[in-house]
Structure formats: C-alpha cells, structure tokens
Amino acid sequence: MAKIQMTTPIVEMDGDEMTRIIWKMIKDILICPYVDLKTDYYDLGLVHRNETNDQVTIDSANATKKYGVAVKCATITPNAQRMTEYNLKEMWKSANGTIRAILDGTVFRAPIIVKGITPLLPGWKKPITIARHAYGDVYKNSEMKVADGSTAELVVTDKDGNETRQLIHKFSGSDGIIQGLHNINASIASFARACFNFALDTKQDLWFATKDTISKKYDHTFKDIFQEIFDNEYKEKFDAAGITYFYTLIDDAVARVVRSEGGYIWACKNYDGDVMSDMVATAFGSLGMMTSVLVSPTGVYEYEAAHGTVTRHYYKHLKGEETSTNSVATLFAWTGALRKRGELDGNKELSDFADKLEKATIKTIEDGVMTGDLYVLSNLDNKRKVNTEDFLLEINNRLKATL
C-alpha cells in the first residue's frame, strides 16, 4: 500500500520520560507505516531545553506560527528536585507556558468517551469541554522569597515615567513570599471570542467563572470583557442558535458542574482551567482519555496530551519492568494534528486516516483491550489488561482492517 503523502510539515515537539517512549512507539507502529510523515522536529526534552537555554522552546513556538499546526509531547516542568536530577542551569519555566504565551489563544480540552467506562459522577451524560485561557497569570509570574522586615509594593511606571505604588505587605515577625501576576486585555478579549465562537460552532452553552467578588480589579476585568463582547458581538447569534452564555462565581460553578449532566463549555482562567480539566478528565475516566488543543486568534493549532510525563512508569521502564501506560491522549494529539493538517491542505486522505486511527483506538478499548488505568474503570465483562506496546499493536490490527 502506498503511503499517504503530506505537502506541509507538522511542527513536532518531542518531550520527556514515559511519554517520550510512547511518542516514538506511536510513530513507529501507527503513523509512519501508513503516512510519509513530514515534520519540523524540535526536541523539548528537558536535557535539550537546558542545553539551549530554553531557546528550542521559543523556536518551536515560532515554527508553529509559520506552519500553522503542531503536535506536542508532554514535558517536565522543573521543580527543585528536577534541578538536582537533571543538573539544570536554572529552573526553566513550563514549556507549555512559554509556547502558550507566544501563540496566545485558548486551550480546549474534552473527554474521549468510550463504552464500558462510566463517569464517576453518574449524572454526567454528555462531555464537558474545558476552555482554558492560555496566557499569563501564575504561568507567566514573577515571585520572590521575602526576608522578615521587608516591605513589598506593587510599582507601575507609566510611559512618561510616573510611578504608582500600592502596598502588598509589610513583613514583620516572619519571612514570607510574594508573587506578581499579569494579564492583558487583548488576550482576554481573544479568549472570550474564541470561547463564543467555539460555542456557536459546537452549539453548546458557554459558562464562565472567576472570583470577581474578591478580586475586584483582576478577575472583575475578565468578567467585564466577556460581558461586553457578548452583548456587543454575540448575543443575537447565541439567541438564534438557541444557546446561552452564563456567568457565575468559580465556587458556584464547581457545584453546578458536579450536579449537571454535562454538554456545555466551561471557560476558565489559566490556573482554574489547569486544575478543572484534570478533575473533569479523571471523573470522566482518565487523564489519558482527554483531548487538548491550543487555538490561537490567528488560526494556529497546537495539539497535545492533557497529562504529564508519567514519571512513575518511566522509572519502571528504566529498570526493565513492564508498563501498561495509557497512550490514548498522546495518540489523539497526533490524530488531531494530522486531521487539521489535512483540512488546511485539502488532503482528505490524511484527514480520513486520522479519523480511522481514532475509531480503531476506541474500538480496541470497547473490544475489552486496554491499559491498566482503564482496566480498573471498565465495566466490560471481556476486558483484559495489556502492556504499553501491545495496546498500540492491538490498535494497529484494527486500523489495518479499515485501510
């Protein structure tokens, strides 16, 4: 069988630990035998990020702007332990945070639903899509440890050199910590429009939540920008589509989500979206069963898995022990990127291949063949647990039957 040809490369961002192992397996077993894969490759593994002073991360984001579609493997965000383990020059920022800051846009995450895996919340009947703002807040912060006796202030210098000062805290009797966050109105507006457009495209209600009662400037600005854009640009379109936009406080939103049946988009600020997408994914089944795509205002797409690097399994793998690691989210990152590349290039064969690969993956699980995390969740009678590689080989058997 002739391989499917590509005209434009996908930006490929390799990653760390067990997901890096899975990344290569997916390409070797499920993609390269069928597709003449063209990628612009960047190694975002922590070792190489350290060697390049994180320049490789910036380069990969700029390449994504150039080509329009990227696929990213999970990467390590270093902490103090990783500083020692990898002998890092400095504690590099989150690769995702850097890429999202350059591309702007919104991260949309939705569960991959399969028969046999019932949500932990039995009332959830339909997918809940998390729309996560991809710029700023704690992911682009500045923070310091502060010595006892210090005074911390916010200082803003305008373009004419005039300073505005606001006291944060006078530290008396104890050392402490401070953190500076920021966001920009243009990015918040892009986030709002992306959410409203996605709601119209998918004909789903849109919820948005912050803590504006406490954060009367920061969070309230998010609320105000959303409301202004909705009233001026989207209200009539939403009415015509029969869908609604709904704002509430973040704690009320969590309570409503738990009681709901799903079937809507939940727009969240950056940190809220990070946390809540994990909660939604786990409650629907597994973090390994979640799609994630960053959509920029200029129509650039970056697909990734919504989970981490699966460190515990990686250490088992290094010892030569067998692992049963769920590769579905990483696989769906690849299929998402291949499908979008096909759509943009008018390459129906490539898009169709991505569809068939996803269907083969779902059929494998619904046939009872799955990794350990899904095995404990599945209520199928004929289920069996397989190892990391065998799961991909089982998918390949079903894929071949459709090609």
List PLM regions with ranges.
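Glycine-rich phosphate/diphosphate-binding loop of Rossmann-like nucleotide-binding domains
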Residues: 6-25, 154-247
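Glycine-rich phosphate/pyrophosphate-binding loop and the adjoining helix
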Residues: 134-135, 140-192, 199, 347, ...
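Glycine-rich phosphate/nucleotide-binding loop
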Residues: 257-356, 363-367
